[in-house]
């Protein structure tokens, strides 16, 4: 029997939405049909009980599909609020990707609304036939990912319903637990395993020991790797990186043996791998601790923007495959950025930033070696470096410092005494003192047409070299003018005008 001991305080928007749904339900009942019982479900109820405002509401209907109810809702709003121009979108079930419920979505009064029917106890199989089978609130609650997400708010009775009998207690005790045996819950949809970790690290809850056993199941890991769309996994990881304790999330994933099935190579990569060194999964706990420490202690890394931290965490997540390479379009490439693209389905700009971290690490270390030997870099050297690294040059240098510390196995407690720390800071200071922070934006001081006209030469590959030389001359001579460059160019002709 459901517990209904908690009363929720709805804001004005939620009250109006509740009234709208109840009115639609009544209108359906007046059409010689069973009046649907409408419940707000899942995350919205959880967050209201935690006193967290939510702009997403899942709506559960007991006697018809979510899309059918949404069509009645759309008709009602077209009559009562034509200016809202409410549109309903139907998202079909996709059992092959463990999405078993048809969903209707709409945006109403600034709220994102998902409408579904109550899950049947065998809903993963019942939708394979043409006949839609409706469940009871208890059946639906038991088929959800966690007890704290299996709570309902009954719009008619205005009470919270806890059909599992554990949701309110687990919410109070800060426990993440599956409503059924974990293997069964994760069997319905393996992505729930990732969601459980996300909820634990978002709300600082502990995962129940029985749920942990299910999370360690190798069969679950294989299903996550092979049967869940990588876009869905990418969405969950994105939420972990943006809204959770990422440090703890990655540690939990590692401790459960789930790192490879979430971040690692897929079957599509197997035949194209060129070098496959031992996965450095043992590095992960130290890498996580190190980055956490540097965010507190290092003068540069503690000032990373949220977007830069996001890229850092993705690079750390793919670190175990740093020394792996893959053949793509006749080119040998390092594996981590490929994993960002394929295993998480993230955008090309994100993939490129992770790639720059790894690809430019040797270049940064070569500059550090020069600094250690000579104590300084030239103005041109700093300008060339920033142009090579691009607008995220600071992050790439910070990553190189992080990687160098990680690889050298420095004791975290001794980092402030490490000589390498000062040299990475010196490199940044050199760039700043030379005013090269935006060297990647420097354009040629003269264009190609002007060069061909002034020197009386034809266009060709040599022109690109001369334009590049004009940029480097500009880096070396920031106070000089275009006329100064033309004079030198006339004196030297097509030969170089840059002092290497």
UniProtKB/Swiss-Prot annotation:
Identify the enzyme class: transferase
> Which family does the record claim for this protein?
Belongs to the tRNA nucleotidyltransferase/poly(A) polymerase family.
Q: Which Gene3D superfamilies does this entry report, sorted A to Z?
A: Beta Polymerase, domain 2 (3.30.460.10), cca-adding enzyme, domain 2 (1.10.3090.10)
Organism name = Schizosaccharomyces pombe (strain 972 / ATCC 24843)
Q: Does the keyword tRNA-binding apply?
A: yes
Q: Name one GO cellular component term.
A: cytosol
Q: What does this protein do?
A: tRNA nucleotidyltransferase involved in the synthesis of the tRNA CCA terminus. In contrast to what is usually observed in eukaryotes for which one enzyme synthesizes the whole tRNA CCA terminus, in S.pombe, cca1 specifically adds two cytidine residues to a tRNA substrate lacking this sequence while cca2 specifically adds the terminal adenosine residue thereby completing the CCA sequence.
Query: Can you quote the domain comment?
Result: Cca1 contains two alpha-helices (His-81 to Thr-86 and Glu-479 to Asp-484) and a beta-sheet (His-120 to Lys-131) that are not seen in cca2, suggesting that cca1 has lost A-adding activity because this beta-sheet reduces the flexibility of the loop (Asp-122 to Glu-139) as compared to CCA- and A-adding enzymes. The ERhxxExxxhh motif (residues 231-241) has been suggested to serve to distinguish between A-adding and CC-adding proteins as A-adding enzymes have a small amino acid in the first position while CC-adding enzymes have an E in the first position.
Provide the residue span(s) of the region labelled Flexible loop: 122-139
Superkingdom per UniProt: Eukaryota
* UniProt-listed Pfam families: PolyA_pol
Please cite one Gene Ontology biological process associated with this protein: mitochondrial tRNA 3'-end processing
Q: Give the E.C. number(s).
A: 2.7.7.-
**What PANTHER family does the database record attribute to this sequence?**
CCA TRNA NUCLEOTIDYLTRANSFERASE, MITOCHONDRIAL, TRNA-NUCLEOTIDYLTRANSFERASE
For this protein, the record's SUPFAM superfamilies field holds: Nucleotidyltransferase, Poly A polymerase C-terminal region-like
Protein name per Swiss-Prot or TrEMBL: tRNA nucleotidyltransferase cca1
Ordered alphabetically, the record's keywords are: Nucleotidyltransferase, RNA-binding, Transferase, tRNA-binding
Instruction: Give the Gene Ontology MF terms in alphabetical order.
Output: CC tRNA cytidylyltransferase activity; CTP binding; tRNA binding
- Per the Swiss-Prot or TrEMBL record, what residue ranges does the short sequence motif ERhxxExxxhh motif cover? 231-241
Q: Which reaction does it catalyse?
A: a tRNA precursor + 2 CTP = a tRNA with a 3' CC end + 2 diphosphate
User: Gene for this protein?
Assistant: cca1
